[in-house]
A protein has these predicted regions:
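N-terminal ligand-binding/catalytic initiation module
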Residues: 2-164
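Conserved helix-loop functional segments at active or binding sites
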Residues: 181-189
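Conserved small/polar residues in nucleotide/adenosyl-binding loops
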Residues: 191-193
Length: 193
């Protein structure tokens, strides 16, 4: 049975058209501040931006106050285990990572950016993610083949000071637990009838 049988029917062309309609892809970056005047632009960039830069240099935690860091998640993959498709490579995983980013925005109002790392080397991936981690409030690892996904997650938890969410592991555990809780609720309600 094809996975498409479980959802509303659509053609391959419709799926491709969805991704190319309007601006290609599914995400964009917009300003959270009004940029209507030259003064607004001067505050957003130079020279006004120097003030929060200095504050963050004195206290890195203030980045959560002056930047989007606290509401910004990186969705990261190397494309080695894309959904049910397998290893299609880093760039082929981009539509999935963009899709996860829009889910973060739609259901939790969390800003997210997709990052595709063109490497199968766990140490290289760990190094890359650890070097960019200060930009984000959290990291979501997605569609990275086992056992590398577990190695990457464990090492990153030791190296960085932000949450590391391994979607294929933690997401499955959360969904399974939710299913069990709901099944118990139903079973208990039937017992009490």
């Amino acid at each position: 049975m094809n996975k498409k049988d479980n959802i509303e029917k659509y053609s391959d062309k419709e799926a491709l058209d969805f991704h190319t309609g309007g601006k290609p892809g599914k995400i964009e970056i917009i300003s959270s501040k009004d940029l209507a005047t030259q003064r607004d632009l001067a505050l957003a960039y130079s020279p006004g931006v120097a003030v929060p830069c200095i504050e963050i240099s004195k206290n890195e935690q203030s980045a959560y106050d002056y930047t989007s860091k606290g509401n910004l998640v990186a969705v990261i993959s190397n494309g080695s285990a894309i959904l049910g498709l397998g290893d299609l490579g880093a760039l082929a995983s981009k539509p999935v990572m963009e899709g996860k980013s829009v889910l973060f925005k739609r259901f939790a109002d969390i800003d997210s950016i997709d990052i595709e790392i063109d490497s199968k080397d766990s140490n290289e991936i760990i190094n890359c993610i650890s070097k960019i981690s200060k930009t984000f409030g959290g990291i979501n690892l997605e569609d990275i083949a086992a056992p590398d996904c577990f190695i990457i997650e464990e090492k990153l938890k030791q190296l960085v000071d932000i949450p590391i969410f391994h979607d294929d592991q933690h997401g499955t555990a959360i969904i399974t637990t939710a299913g069990l809780i709901n099944a118990l609720d139903i079973a208990l309600s039937l017992i009490h009838i």
